[in-house]
């Protein structure tokens, strides 16, 4: 069984949107409501607990929801790199993604999502990530190629951070 050591949380991304994964619950009641974090080792991370409306089979998360969570946390690894290395914001989007479902993610249980950049080749960012439990056991594994969006590189869009609170995890 593959496990992972927890990492210290060092920053929190700010969210204001209505998305299915990171949307604010008050703006999208069916959102997973994930906060995204910068981890000390340069990974991105999140903590989540799914609700019954996120299920596929009885009390099991729909694979599309877990894929969306992994896509989001892997995408945020680009912004984690920008934070850690003090780089300019670069918009990215998913080019390809593959998910391996090792065991069911259950509704009502707490899980963690983590993502990291494995390598960069030109506009391509090769990224991997996992959904794990509190013991570090892997439930879903993802690999993706993200592409930079050169037409948006000079936009005013940027990633913002917000202060950490006592309710934020200390490690993921």
Regions found by a protein language model. Give the residues of each.
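HotDog/MaoC-like acyl-thioester-processing domains
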Residues: 1-13, 105-107, 118-172
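Non-catalytic linker/capping segments at the edges of enzyme domains
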Residues: 1-55, 168-172
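Short coil/loop residues immediately preceding or within conserved phosphate-binding loops
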Residues: 31, 94-96, 124-126
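Residues located in well-ordered beta-strands
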Residues: 35, 98-100, 112-116, 128-130, ...
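Active-site helix/loop of acyl-thioester processing domains in fatty-acid/polyketide metabolism
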Residues: 43, 61-87
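Hydrophobic residues in beta-strands and at strand termini
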Residues: 48-50, 101, 148
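Short histidine-centered catalytic/ligand-binding loop motif
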Residues: 52-64
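Hydrophobic beta-strand-centered segment that forms part of the acyl-chain substrate-binding groove
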Residues: 75-112
């Amino acid at each position: 069984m593959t496990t992972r050591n927890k990492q210290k949380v060092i920053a929190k991304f700010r969210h204001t949107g209505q998305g299915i994964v990171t949307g604010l619950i008050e703006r999208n009641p069916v959102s997973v409501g994930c906060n995204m974090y910068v981890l000390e080792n340069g990974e991105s991370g999140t903590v989540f607990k799914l609700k019954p409306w996120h299920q596929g089979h009885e009390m099991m998360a729909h694979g599309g929801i877990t894929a969306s969570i992994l896509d989001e946390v892997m995408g945020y690894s680009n912004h984690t790199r920008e934070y850690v290395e003090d780089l300019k914001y670069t918009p990215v989007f998913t080019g390809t993604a593959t998910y391996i479902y090792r065991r069911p993610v259950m509704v009502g249980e707490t899980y963690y999502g983590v993502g990291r950049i494995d390598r960069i080749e030109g506009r391509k960012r090769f990224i991997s990530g996992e959904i794990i439990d509190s013991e570090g056991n892997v439930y879903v594994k993802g690999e993706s190629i993200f592409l930079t969006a050169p037409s948006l590189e000079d936009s005013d869009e940027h990633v913002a951070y917000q202060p950490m609170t006592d309710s934020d995890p200390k490690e993921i």
